[in-house]
């Protein structure tokens, strides 16, 4: 069942690094504010934990918007879904909720961004890829970003022995099983057993997407490095130096990769990996003008 987010006492158990964060509760979207005011509103040391009430569904009338540190031009909307990790049922629920929201609240320009990590850990990585290939929400521009798990899988399937070992220890065994590849299959035979269209999908993934003042990436960026000069390793795998930074990145970075019990909203970034595939939920952020709402499955 889809529900609005509420803070949990601890992060879901998962072999992935977690982080905690809080946001201030707002009752409705507000006009864009100057950056100093936004920073003050979102100062995590000065505001209480946000605990919205439970609801039965995430339809258009139930979206609960809060002030966002970023903005989109009027008439534009972006849906961004965090790390999926093989959770096909939850992804289908969010896509259905997005389709319903779009039907009830049309907008001039709508983009759906998936932030990567479609595979590993969860029960149906192959099903997730097939679902994404089928363009699950009609009428939207869809951007599929690469995650570190896709990068590792591609390297492993290309014959990188170290990557193959890493992959097997970080959920790759569940992905292989979803392709009906037995654990004792020689590694050199994996690639030939992966559906051709699935491999093409993995190879087609983008590293980033820009919209308004937002930069959508899988993991984050390297502080102190110009956005145009960021490297793939950081975009797919950075953690602490990015998460701990309070500097202005030149864009509000929307990312996954580091799991937390609920979305993390900071003056310079918004994290929406909430532990899907590892006991947590799958989160979708909805961006409009200078506001953001969250729905989960």
PLM-predicted stretches and their roles:
Residues 75, 107-109, 139-141, 212, ...:
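A general structural motif
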Residues 166-271, 275-281, 287-297:
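Acidic, His/Gly-enriched loop-helix segments that form or flank divalent-metal centers
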Residues 87-165:
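Core catalytic region of metal-dependent phosphoesterases/phosphodiesterases
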Residues 56-67, 93-97, 126, 196, ...:
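Short, motif-level signal for alpha-helix interfacial/capping segments enriched in acidic residues
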Residues 66-74, 103-105, 133-136, 207-210, ...:
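A short acidic-Thr-Gly-centered motif at the start of a beta-strand
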Residues 85-86, 120, 151, 221, ...:
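Short, glycine/acidic-enriched loop or turn micro-motifs at the edges of active sites
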Residues 81-82, 113-116, 143-148, 252-258, ...:
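Active-site neighborhood of phospho(di)ester-bond hydrolases with catalytic His/Asp-centered motifs
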Residues 2-6, 10-93:
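Short glycine- and acidic-rich boundary segments immediately preceding or forming the N-terminal edge
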């Amino acid at each position: 069942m889809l529900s609005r987010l509420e803070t949990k006492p601890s992060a879901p158990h998962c072999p992935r690094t977690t982080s905690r964060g809080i946001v201030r509760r707002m009752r409705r979207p507000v006009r864009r504010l100057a950056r100093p005011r936004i920073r003050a509103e979102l100062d995590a040391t000065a505001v209480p934990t946000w605990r919205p009430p439970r609801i039965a569904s995430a339809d258009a009338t139930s979206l609960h918007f809060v002030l966002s540190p970023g903005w989109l031009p009027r008439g534009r909307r972006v849906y961004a879904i965090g790390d999926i990790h093989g959770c096909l049922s939850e992804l289908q629920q969010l896509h259905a909720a997005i389709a319903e929201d779009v039907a009830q609240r049309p907008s001039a320009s709508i983009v759906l961004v998936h932030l990567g990590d479609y595979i590993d850990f969860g029960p149906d990585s192959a099903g997730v890829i097939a679902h994404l290939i089928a363009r699950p929400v009609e009428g939207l521009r869809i951007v599929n970003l690469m995650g570190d798990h896709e990068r590792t899988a591609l390297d492993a399937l290309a014959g990188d022995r170290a990557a193959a070992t890493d992959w097997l220890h970080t959920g790759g065994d569940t992905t292989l099983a979803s392709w009906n590849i037995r654990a004792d299959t020689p590694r050199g035979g994996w690639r030939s057993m992966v559906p051709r269209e699935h491999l093409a999908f993995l190879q087609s993934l983008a590293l980033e997407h820009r919209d308004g003042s937002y930069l959508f990436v899988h993991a984050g960026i390297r502080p102190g490095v110009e956005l145009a000069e960021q490297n793939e390793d950081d975009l797919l795998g950075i953690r602490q130096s990015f998460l701990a930074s309070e500097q202005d990145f030149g864009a509000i970075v929307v990312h996954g990769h580091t799991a937390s019990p609920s979305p993390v909203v900071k003056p310079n970034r918004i994290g929406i990996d909430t532990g899907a595939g590892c006991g947590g939920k799958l989160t979708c952020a909805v961006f409009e003008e200078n506001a953001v709402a969250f729905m989960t499955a």
